[in-house]
Amino acid sequence: MFRGVANLNLDTKGRMAMPSRYRDRLVETCEGRLVITVDRDGCLLVYPQPEWERIEQALMSRPNMDRQVRRLQRLLVGHATECELDGQGRILLPPPLRDYAGLDKRVVLVGQGNKFELWDEDTWVKSRDEWFKEEDETAEPSAVLESLSL
């Protein structure tokens, strides 16, 4: 389970040091092999490779005659890029993925259970604040969330 928020920096080559609290688990569970792809919210999704393979298999087993399925396959699988933690626990983020998410220097890594989201810091702060505001304005939880006692 990956949880928590970490503010990080990209170096001039586009590498990000994975926080040590995740590094050992990633080496144990997937030998440091990760898959990075795009998300419709403007961030990147970072999966341990075995978890990505499970998701990819499920997605690709759907009928691609369905327009939404086909689009999701194109976006997620089409942009999926394998990478590996180097000896210092860093991952190299490919330029096209950095460009998509607007990643330059300051980034935020957000644990999401089976994966991470990787955001440009300014975009993360703006989005997070908007979500809190929307939540305050809505005040009524969805039926799915009511049972969680959050």
From Swiss-Prot:
A Pfam family reported for this protein in Swiss-Prot or TrEMBL: MraZ
Keyword Electron transport found: no
One record GO biological process: negative regulation of DNA-templated transcription initiation
SUPFAM superfamilies: AbrB/MazE/MraZ-like
Protein name: Transcriptional regulator MraZ
A cellular component annotation (GO) from this entry: nucleoid
Taxonomic classification: Bacteria, Pseudomonadati, Pseudomonadota, Gammaproteobacteria, Chromatiales
Family note: Belongs to the MraZ family.
Main localization, broad class: cytoplasm
Coiled-coil annotated residue ranges, if any: none
Keyword tags: Cytoplasm, DNA-binding, Repeat, Transcription, Transcription regulation
Alphabetized Gene3D superfamilies for the sequence: Transcriptional regulator MraZ domain (3.40.1550.20)
Domain of life: Bacteria
Localization in the cell: Cytoplasm, Nucleoid
